[in-house]
């Protein structure tokens, strides 16, 4: 039971962290995971539209 609660907490926390990173479309990135959904890491290492 505690494992389920912790798992749910970390999933929500990851989601909030990713939303926190989504403020700017030109955020620096290394991989597509560093960008929010709908954006990808461009060759200039900035989050841009897909």
UniProtKB/Swiss-Prot annotation:
The keyword Disulfide bond applies. Keywords: Disulfide bond, Ion channel impairing toxin, Knottin, Secreted, Signal, Toxin. It is found in: Secreted. It comes from the Eukaryota. One of its GO terms (molecular function) is ion channel regulator activity. Disulfide bonds join 22-36, 29-41, 35-47. Expressed by the venom gland. One of its GO terms (cellular component) is extracellular region. Belongs to the neurotoxin 10 (Hwtx-1) family. 64 (Jztx-20) subfamily. Probable ion channel inhibitor. The presence of a 'disulfide through disulfide knot' structurally defines this protein as a knottin. This is U23-theraphotoxin-Cg1a 2. It comes from Chilobrachys guangxiensis. The lineage of its organism: Eukaryota, Metazoa, Ecdysozoa, Arthropoda, Chelicerata.
